[in-house]
Amino acid sequence: MSASSITKPSSPLYLITHEFYPVSGGIATFAEEIAKASAGLGYDVEVWAQSAPPEREKKWPFRMRRLPLKGTQDLTCQIRLARELIACRRQLRHATVYIPEPGPMLTMMFLQFFRAFRPKRLILTFHGTEILSFSSSPLRRWLAGRLIRHASRVSTLTTYTQELLLERFPHAADKIFLTPGALRTDFAVVPPRADRAKDKIVVLTVGRLHPRKGQLITLKALQMLPGAVKGRIEYWIVGGRNWGNYEEKLREQAGSDPALNVRFFGNIPDEELAHVYDRSDIFALTSVSHGTSVEGFGLVYLEAAAHALPIIAHNIGGVSEAVRDGETGLLVTPDRPAELAAAFEKLFHDGALRRRLGEAGRAFAARNCWEENASTLFASANDQA
C-alpha cells in the first residue's frame, strides 16, 4: 500500500520512543528522520523521548519532551512512561500517537484497556525482532494483536518484516504499509571514489558489539584466508554498547592470529564515521539470528553503499532488501564459513568487481526518502492508492 495524497491532521502528532538521539542505531535514526520529515511536511510534531544530557541536545524543527526514563524495556521504564501517558491522556486523546519501536508499545499494550486513554489515531512501526518477541507467548500475542486492531495504520521497513507481521498477526492486513529505510538527511554527499593504489585492503564493520551483528563470524572468516591475502587485509571494527563479554571474545580471537591486523575503534560520531568509510574498501556485516532477535533491514548497509563500498553480508531476515546480491554486494548463507571466506577472497582479488558493486550501491542507497515515508504514515485514513 502507499498513500498517494496528504491530508495533514489539525490535531498534533506525538512521536513516542525510547530510542532517540543521542542513542545511536537504526531505530533511533528512523525515529529522528520520521520526526524531521513530518515537521517539514507541516505536521505539528512533538517528540517524547528518553532522558539525555542537556549539553547533548540538538536544536530540533519540532518540540522535544525528554521523559524521566533511561529508555530500556524494563519495568521501571514502562511504569514511568505509563505515568506520563496517563497524566497527558486528555491531550493525547485528540491527537495522533505514533510509536516507532517496541518499548512504548509494551506500555500501550496495558493502557489500551482504559477507555479514558485512547488516542484519536494510533500508528505503529515494526522492525522485526519485536514481532518475534510479541508472538512468543499466548499472552503477548493477544496483547499485541489487540493493540494492532486499535491502530489506524502499521508499517514495516521491508517486505520480509511485513510478511512476518502478517504471518503472526494476520488482522493487520487491511492497514499495513511499507516505510523503507533511507539515508540520514544529514548524510554528507559522497563524491565518487578515486582509484588509488593501496598496500592494504580495509574491511569495515559498523554496528554495536553483539553476537547478532556477527563481528566474530567475520573475523574468523578473514582468519581463514591464505596467508598472502590475510597479510594485506586490515579488519576495522566500529561500535560500542558491548553485550556481555563479547568484546573480550573478539579481542581474544583477534590475538590468536597476528597475521591479520584488527583495529577496534569503539563508538565514533557520525561526522567522523564518514572518514572511516572513505578509508575502507569492503563493508561487512554478517548478522545472524540470536534468540528472538533478527536483522529486519539495516540502515548501516545503505550508508556503506552510499560510500561506494561493496558489501558482504548474510542472506538473512530483511538484509536482501538492503543489499542486492551480485548488484551491490555479495550475500552468503549463514553458517557457511568457507563460503564467507571465499566471498572475501573474491573481492580482495577483483578490484573491478569491488568498483562495480560500489557504484551500483551509491545509486541504490539514494532511492528512498523520509518525506514519502512520513506521508505514507500520517496521510488521512481516507487517502489510499
Model-derived segments and spans:
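Conserved acidic donor-binding segment of nucleotide-sugar-dependent glycosyltransferases
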Residues: R324-G326, L330-P337, K346-A352
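Glycosyltransferase donor-sugar binding loop
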Residues: S51-P53, E234-K249
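Nucleotide-activated donor-binding/catalytic signature segment of Leloir-type glycosyltransferases, i.e.
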Residues: G239, E247-E272
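Short hydrophobic beta-strand element within catalytic cores of glycosyltransferases
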Residues: Y301, A306, P310-A313, V323
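Conserved donor-binding/catalytic core segment of Leloir-type glycosyltransferases
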Residues: S155, D195-K213, L219-Q223, W236
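Carbohydrate-associated surface elements
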Residues: Y160, A182
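Acidic donor-binding loop of glycosyltransferase active sites
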Residues: D278-S293, L309
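Short His-centered aromatic/hydrophobic patch
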Residues: I99-M105, F126
